[in-house]
């Protein structure tokens, strides 16, 4: 058969899954074999098989904030899932496991530790997740996207993103010749962000017509009708879609993005070279989205606007103060933060650990 076998452990959110898929592509391009350890009834169960990757699942859910009964059952659940993960590792003769985060990462990593299989972890957020914090004690390599997530030397590799985003022309080239209204992209994730859907149309309505940017607004699943109705009722022109299938073109054409501050979003903004008005999701575990946003803001690549301070009046004030020159400067600063070879760096670290 040739090549080594790697088990990727990632699940729960796209922020864990899509960076892992980029690493899977890099490993397979080098002639290696990849299997995936995920959770049952999960996002990864819907996504991963589409990429031709063998998916194995464990029956495990998160423990933070859940009821006392589930917490009391945790030792039993952990024992059962670790045993099942050991069976999967033996069955596929896994030579290295790579943990990206999510509920499944800890039992999979513990199983690898007990079997003497090397562990590599990659942390996508500025604040390390619970599973990765535990596994870092046993990992042969600790890799991370933000400088302060861990302190392990040589571990800063950035977040893996799609090559077609990293390969976009530099901001100065994209912005050349642009005139007229700013073009602003609004994305709140695949489910949308109700606060953005509500506030952005109201903010634009407060601006004079000739000062309003051109808007391309992703509503999120099931919210297109209500979003378009809000824009129409306020007399504001906007192009609204439920879900953007071609994010590369959306990034290419935008002058600025209004968005949340998930790890994958930050990685794509820096890879593309785009400034942003960042409204972190306030209920994220350990408030990691605020820490992610500060990474861009400290580089003068955008503004952090806490959701508690997000009003139509405040957003209108910010939008009214923007011009293309400022957006270009933010975009150029964002691009300096990019680490475009992240997927290959993670893959090569894992290959070295499996040797």
From Swiss-Prot:
Taken from the record, one Pfam family name reads Glyco_transf_28
Q: Which reaction does it catalyse?
A: di-trans,octa-cis-undecaprenyl diphospho-N-acetyl-alpha-D-muramoyl-L-alanyl-D-glutamyl-meso-2,6-diaminopimeloyl-D-alanyl-D-alanine + UDP-N-acetyl-alpha-D-glucosamine = di-trans,octa-cis-undecaprenyl diphospho-[N-acetyl-alpha-D-glucosaminyl-(1->4)]-N-acetyl-alpha-D-muramoyl-L-alanyl-D-glutamyl-meso-2,6-diaminopimeloyl-D-alanyl-D-alanine + UDP + H(+)
Query: Which SUPFAM superfamilies does the annotation name?
Result: UDP-Glycosyltransferase/glycogen phosphorylase
Q: Which residues bind UDP-N-acetyl-alpha-D-glucosamine?
A: 13-15, 125, 162, 190, 244, 289
Stored CDD domains:
GT28_MurG
Q: What is its EC number?
A: 2.4.1.227
According to its UniProt entry, the protein's GO biological process terms are: carbohydrate metabolic process; cell division; cell wall organization; lipid glycosylation; peptidoglycan biosynthetic process; regulation of cell shape
Q: What class of enzyme is it?
A: transferase
Q: Name one GO molecular function term.
A: UDP-N-acetyl-D-glucosamine:N-acetylmuramoyl-L-alanyl-D-glutamyl-meso-2,6-diaminopimelyl-D-alanyl-D-alanine-diphosphoundecaprenol 4-beta-N-acetylglucosaminlytransferase activity
What membrane topology is annotated for this entry?
A: Peripheral membrane protein
- What pathway does the UniProt record associate with this protein? Cell wall biogenesis; peptidoglycan biosynthesis
Keywords (alphabetical) are: Cell cycle, Cell division, Cell inner membrane, Cell membrane, Cell shape, Cell wall biogenesis/degradation, Glycosyltransferase, Membrane, Peptidoglycan synthesis, Transferase
Gene Ontology cellular-component annotations: plasma membrane
Localisation per UniProt entry? Cell inner membrane
Tell me, in one coarse class, where this protein mainly resides: membrane
| Family classification | Belongs to the glycosyltransferase 28 family. MurG subfamily.
Function statement: Cell wall formation. Catalyzes the transfer of a GlcNAc subunit on undecaprenyl-pyrophosphoryl-MurNAc-pentapeptide (lipid intermediate I) to form undecaprenyl-pyrophosphoryl-MurNAc-(pentapeptide)GlcNAc (lipid intermediate II).
PANTHER family listed in its UniProt record: GLYCOSYLTRANSFERASE, UDP-N-ACETYLGLUCOSAMINE--N-ACETYLMURAMYL-(PENTAPEPTIDE) PYROPHOSPHORYL-UNDECAPRENOL N-ACETYLGLUCOSAMINE TRANSFERASE 1
- NCBIfam families assigned to the protein according to its UniProt record, in alphabetical order: murG
This one is known as UDP-N-acetylglucosamine--N-acetylmuramyl-(pentapeptide) pyrophosphoryl-undecaprenol N-acetylglucosamine transferase
Q: What is the lineage of its organism?
A: Bacteria, Pseudomonadati, Pseudomonadota, Betaproteobacteria, Neisseriales
Annotated gene: murG
């Amino acid at each position: 058969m040739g090549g080594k076998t790697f088990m990727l452990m990632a699940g729960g959110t796209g922020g864990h899954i899509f960076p892992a898929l980029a690493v899977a592509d890099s490993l397979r391009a080098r002639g290696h074999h990849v299997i995936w350890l995920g959770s049952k009834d999960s996002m990864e169960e819907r996504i991963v098989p589409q990429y031709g990757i063998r998916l194995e699942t464990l029956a495990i859910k998160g423990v933070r904030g859940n009821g006392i009964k589930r917490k009391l059952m945790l030792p039993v659940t952990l024992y059962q899932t670790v045993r099942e993960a050991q069976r999967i590792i033996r069955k596929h003769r896994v030579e290295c496991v790579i943990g990206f985060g999510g509920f499944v990462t800890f039992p999979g990593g513990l199983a690898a530790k007990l079997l003497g299989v090397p562990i590599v972890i990659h942390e996508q957020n500025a604040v390390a997740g619970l599973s990765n914090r535990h596994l870092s004690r046993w990992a042969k390599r600790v890799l991370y996207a933000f400088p302060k997530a861990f302190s392990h030397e040589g571990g800063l590799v950035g977040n893996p993103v799609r090559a077609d985003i990293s390969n976009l022309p530099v901001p100065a080239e994209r912005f050349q010749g642009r005139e007229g209204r700013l073009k602003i992209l609004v994305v709140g994730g695949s489910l949308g962000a109700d606060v953005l859907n509500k506030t952005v149309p109201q903010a634009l309505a407060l601006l004079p017509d000739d000062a309003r940017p051109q808007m391309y607004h992703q509503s999120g699943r099931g919210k297109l009708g209500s979003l378009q109705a809000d824009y129409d009722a306020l007399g504001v022109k906007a192009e609204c879609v439920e879900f953007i299938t071609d994010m590369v073109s959306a990034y290419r054409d935008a002058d600025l993005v209004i968005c949340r501050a998930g790890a994958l979003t930050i990685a794509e903004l820096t890879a593309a070279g785009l400034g942003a008005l960042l409204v972190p999701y306030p209920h994220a575990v350990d408030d990691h989205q605020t820490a992610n946003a500060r990474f861009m803001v400290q580089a003068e690549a955008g503004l952090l606007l806490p959701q508690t301070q997000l009003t139509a009046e405040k957003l209108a004030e910010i939008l009214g103060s923007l011009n293309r020159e400022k957006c270009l400067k933010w975009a150029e600063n964002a691009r300096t933060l990019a680490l475009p070879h992240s997927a290959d760096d993670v893959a090569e670290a894992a290959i070295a650990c499996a040797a």
